[in-house]
Every structure is written in structure tokens, then in C-alpha cells.
């Protein structure tokens, strides 16, 4: 999946007993020591936070999540709880929330399923089954329809080639198939798009997009914009943008969540928490390059209080 600047901050001197004790003290009695909570949550890896959760429960006989729910509030609470989940569990909860009740938040399904690796998709499916005792694929099938359902179900198979080899002949053939399926005829044959966008490696897709450009002197994005609409268009464009430059895609999403009036805190939390140990360093560099300002500075000016402090700490 290209270069992933991992930020696995495994700490020398990680002491699970000390952290559990410190968190207990931070949440005991009158008032909460938010600074202590921020310091621990932001400077431990996801695996270390799992150990802290287990230690806390074994020592104090209660779930750290429940303690946070009663002691914290607002976006600070949301972020702290997100950090107590494994990334796959957090994604699974977001997906369930997007589908439960009336109506479906398709944007969340697209954002998660179109941007995860095979291994991540498998982990999300397993977490969803474990947390909700339901199949993610069945729920997605029941909650979406038509061509959007088809592409999401294809992605849920976690069948993308993740090798490094590029087959030039295949790229040419795929480009021709995409042209025949879209621009080349009335109505779009989504099957060809699903086959290519859900199964080829990012490197292979970049070769296909190049071949497409040469073949008809047009970007694949332009064809998708002309031929599709709504959520299907959003899904295809997300897949294309991630194949072209995944870190750039997330940098754009973060920028859009903050620019103008109002802030989309859900997107901010979701991206910063789930990319923290994947490619957040690369996303930060891309953000600086594209927008001539640091992601931390923009987060600082767009958020406030303990929520701001926790996000900024996660970005360092």
C-alpha cells in the first residue's frame, strides 16, 4: 500500500501498573486530572492502551470506558473512548453507528471501507461480529442498495492485490475496459469499475489511470464525475484518490473538516485516531506541503480545551 510512515511509539519504560494507577488517581474524588489522562493516552501505542485497560479492570474491578463516560464529556470524551478501542473496533463501532436506526450514513461506510487494507478489513469484520454479534457484510447488504452495495460488498471481500509488481499489459486492458464500461457507451457498466477499483493494487491502479489518460486524453476522475453521481461517485472517487495518494487524500479530508465556519469534529477524531500508527506522519507532511500550514496549528485554531490538547498531543 505504498509507504506507510508508521508511528508505533512503543515506549521504553512503559509501565502498565504505573499507568493504571495514574489513571485511577486522575479520575478519583472531586474533579478530574485531564492532563494526566491526555499524557497517558497520547503517548502509548494502541497495544499498550489495551494492556492498561485490562490492568485497570483487574486492579479496580471496573471498566476504564465506563469511568471515562462518567468523568469526561463532549469531544474530549469521544476521543478518549476512541483511543481505548483497537483501530478495528473503533472502525466497527463507527460502521454500526452509521447503519443503526433509520437512514444510513453512507459517507462513513465509504470513508472506512474504501480506504482500508485487506488485513484491516478482515480485522474490522471480526471486531464487528464480536462486538455486535452480527455480520458486517449482511448489515451492509441490508442497508445499501444497487451499485453502491455492489462496490462495498466487493471491498468487504478483502481481495485486493497488495503486491508491488505492475503489469503494463493488464493496465492497458483495464483502462480499455473502464473506457468501454463508462465513457465509451450509454450507461455505465459498474461491474468493470468494481472489478478494477476493488481488486487491483494501488501501484497497478496508478498505471491503469495513466494508461486511461493516454487512451482518451482524460482523467479517470473526469469520467467518473460525468458518468456517476451521489454515493457511488463518492466511493469511486475515494478509491481513485487513495490509489493515487492515500496520505494526500486524508490531508484533504482533514483540511475540509476544518476550513470555513464550523468544524467537523467526527472526521477530525476518526482520521487522527485511526491513522495515528499507520501514516499520520506522512499525512502531516502532505498537509504542510499542500496547505502551507501545519496540521497541528490548524487543529489548535479550530478546537479548544482538553479536546484540543489531546488532538495536538496525538499529532506530535
From Swiss-Prot:
MF (Gene Ontology): calcium ion binding; calcium-dependent phospholipid binding; phosphatidylserine binding
Annexin-type repeats, residues: 14-85, 86-157, 169-241, 245-316
One cellular-component annotation, GO: plasma membrane
Predominant place of localization: membrane
Lipid tethering residues (N-myristoyl glycine): 2
Topology relative to the membrane: Lipid-anchor
Subcellular location, record wording: Apical cell membrane; Cell membrane; Cytoplasmic vesicle
InterPro entries: Annexin, Annexin_repeat, Annexin_repeat_CS, Annexin_sf, ANX13
Signal peptide (residue range): none
Transmembrane segments: none
PROSITE patterns reported for this sequence: ANNEXIN_1, ANNEXIN_2
Keywords from the named record: Annexin, Calcium, Calcium/phospholipid-binding, Cell membrane, Cytoplasmic vesicle, Lipoprotein, Membrane, Myristate, Repeat
Pfam families: Annexin
GO biological process annotation, one example: negative regulation of Golgi to plasma membrane protein transport
PANTHER family in the cross-refs: ANNEXIN, ANNEXIN A13
Protein family membership: Belongs to the annexin family.
Recorded domain comment: A pair of annexin repeats may form one binding site for calcium and phospholipid.
Name this polypeptide is given: Annexin A13
Species per Swiss-Prot/TrEMBL record: Canis lupus familiaris (Dog)
Amino acid at each position: 500500500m505504498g509507504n506507510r510512515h508508521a508511528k508505533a511509539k512503543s515506549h521504553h519504560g512503559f509501565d502498565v501498573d504505573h499507568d493504571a494507577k495514574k489513571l485511577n488517581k486522575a479520575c478519583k474524588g472531586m474533579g478530574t486530572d485531564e492532563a494526566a489522562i491526555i499524557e497517558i493516552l497520547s503517548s502509548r501505542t494502541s497495544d499498550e492502551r489495551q494492556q492498561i485497560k485490562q490492568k485497570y479492570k483487574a486492579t479496580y474491578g471496573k471498566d476504564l470506558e465506563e469511568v471515562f463516560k462518567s468523568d469526561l464529556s463532549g469531544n474530549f470524551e469521544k476521543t478518549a473512548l476512541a483511543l481505548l478501542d483497537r483501530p478495528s473496533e473503533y472502525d466497527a463501532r463507527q460502521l454500526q453507528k452509521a447503519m443503526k436506526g433509520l437512514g444510513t450514513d453512507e459517507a462513513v461506510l465509504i470513508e472506512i471501507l474504501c480506504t482500508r487494507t485487506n488485513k484491516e478489513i478482515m480485522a474490522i469484520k471480526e471486531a464487528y461480529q464480536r462486538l455486535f454479534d452480527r455480520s458486517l457484510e449482511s448489515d451492509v447488504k441490508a442497508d445499501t442498495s444497487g451499485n453502491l452495495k455492489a462496490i462495498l460488498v466487493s471491498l468487504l471481500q478483502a481481495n485486493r492485490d497488495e503486491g508491488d509488481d505492475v503489469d503494463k499489459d493488464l493496465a492497458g486492458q483495464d483502462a480499455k475496459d473502464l473506457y468501454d464500461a463508462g465513457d465509451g457507451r450509454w450507461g455505465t457498466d459498474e461491474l468493470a469499475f468494481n472489478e478494477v477499483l476493488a481488486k487491483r493494487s494501488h501501484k497497478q491502479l496508478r498505471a491503469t489511470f495513466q494508461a486511461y489518460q493516454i487512451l482518451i486524453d482524460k482523467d479517470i476522475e473526469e469520467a467518473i464525475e460525468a458518468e456517476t453521481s451521489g454515493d457511488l461517485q463518492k466511493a469511486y472517487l475515494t478509491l481513485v484518490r487513495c490509489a493515487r495518494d492515500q496520505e494526500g487524500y486524508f490531508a484533504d479530508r482533514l483540511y475540509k473538516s476544518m476550513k470555513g465556519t464550523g468544524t467537523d469534529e467526527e472526521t477530525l477524531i476518526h482520521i487522527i485516531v485511526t491513522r495515528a500508527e499507520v501514516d499520520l506522519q506522512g499525512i502531516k507532511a502532505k498537509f504542510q506541503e499542500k496547505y502551507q500550514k501545519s496540521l497541528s496549528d490548524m487543529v489548535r485554531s479550530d478546537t479548544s480545551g482538553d479536546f484540543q490538547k489531546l488532538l495536538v498531543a496525538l499529532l506530535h
